[in-house]
């Protein structure tokens, strides 16, 4: 039986959700968008609202040229000031093919320097599809929508040990239809996942399998059982890059004209808020909401 609890109304949310009180020195966030195979415009609005509603962040948005055939002159006008922000939330996916859209090299270098010098990054869902030919980006994401020849893959066995599948072996990336599934916390001691139940339900998500990449320095926080390939797939992980911290979540699927069910999940919202704070500061002080999902019950919140 699919159990769903939906929290409605501002008063109910404030009482039941466990929102942190607004903080005086808010964390500065830049969301980058402009291209994605998902509904990035609606997704950015929802990500921004989730972060701002926590009372912990100020959020700006920087949008790239939205046309894959954009001219050099159009791209020359896009020069985000990453250094102005404590953390960048990446909602951009210009395509997984090596020939797909890259950022101008000047911007890529600025982003690399930003993270190397201590800037935080949050990669949301399809953001790890992008930039197959950008080596530094691949180091930041660890795993992405890359084929078996690109690099190793990681799965979690039934003893909760991370298993490396060598380059050239295993599966190419893919996913089945969106469905409800159970998330499992692998590291309950990390600030992002602290206090979460060992298992909790997440709704109507796209569960990706067979991702490949450098897979270096990855610390996996959560995983989920893929019924499509009968393996445990990493869902959330963190990677150090220089002095910076990168948090990747595979949650947050939002298709064009599709429901925003995944982003209304209290579990997703908690991961996003905590992951963004952690990427920026190395801490996660956002309390576990009282309406957090359980092992058997999905919990959703209006945004």
Language model regions located:
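Active-site rim elements
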Residues: 34-37, 125, 166-171, 176-181, ...
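Helical hinge/lid and interdomain linker segments adjacent to catalytic or ligand-binding clefts
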Residues: 26-123, 127-131
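Short, solvent-exposed loop/turn segments at secondary-structure junctions
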Residues: 36-37, 94-95, 128-130, 198, ...
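Catalytic beta-strand/loop cores that center a nucleophilic Ser/Cys/Thr
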Residues: 52, 58, 159-245
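Bacterial N-terminal signal peptides
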Residues: 5-16
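Extracytoplasmic/secreted proteins, especially bacterial periplasmic and envelope-associated proteins
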Residues: 42, 46, 84, 106, ...
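A glycine-rich, often tryptophan-bearing local segment used as a flexible ligand/cofactor-contacting loop or short
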Residues: 94-191
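Extracellular ligand-binding/catalytic regions of CAZymes and related secreted enzymes
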Residues: 21-27, 42-43, 53, 80, ...
């Amino acid at each position: 039986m699919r159990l769903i609890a939906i929290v409605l109304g501002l008063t109910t949310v404030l009482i039941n959700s466990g929102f942190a009180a607004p903080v005086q020195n808010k964390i500065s966030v830049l969301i980058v968008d402009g291209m994605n195979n998902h509904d990035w415009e609606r997704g950015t609005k929802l990500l921004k609202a989730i972060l701002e509603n926590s009372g912990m962040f100020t959020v700006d948005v920087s949008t790239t040229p939205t046309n894959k055939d954009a001219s050099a002159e159009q791209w020359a006008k896009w020069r985000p000031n990453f250094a102005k922000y404590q953390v960048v939330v990446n909602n951009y996916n210009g395509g997984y093919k090596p020939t797909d859209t890259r950022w101008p090299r000047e911007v890529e270098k600025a982003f690399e320097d930003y993270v190397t010098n201590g800037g935080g990054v949050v990669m949301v869902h399809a953001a790890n599809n992008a930039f197959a030919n950008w080596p530094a980006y691949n180091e930041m994401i660890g795993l992405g929508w890359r084929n078996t020849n690109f690099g190793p893959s990681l799965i979690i066995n039934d003893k909760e040990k991370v298993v490396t599948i060598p380059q050239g072996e295993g599966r190419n990336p893919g996913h089945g239809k969106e469905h409800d599934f159970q998330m499992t916390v692998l590291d309950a001691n990390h600030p992002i996942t602290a206090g979460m139940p060992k298992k909790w339900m997440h709704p109507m998500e796209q569960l990706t399998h067979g991702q490949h990449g450098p897979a270096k320095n990855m610390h996996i926080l959560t995983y989920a059982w893929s019924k499509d390939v009968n393996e445990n797939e990493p869902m959330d992980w963190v990677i150090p890059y220089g002095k910076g911290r990168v948090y990747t979540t595979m949650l947050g699927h939002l298709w064009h004209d599709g429901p925003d069910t995944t982003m209304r999940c209290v579990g997703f919202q908690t991961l996003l808020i905590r992951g963004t704070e952690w990427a920026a500061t190395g801490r996660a002080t956002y309390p576990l909401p009282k309406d957090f999902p359980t092992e058997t019950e999905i919990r959703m919140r209006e945004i």
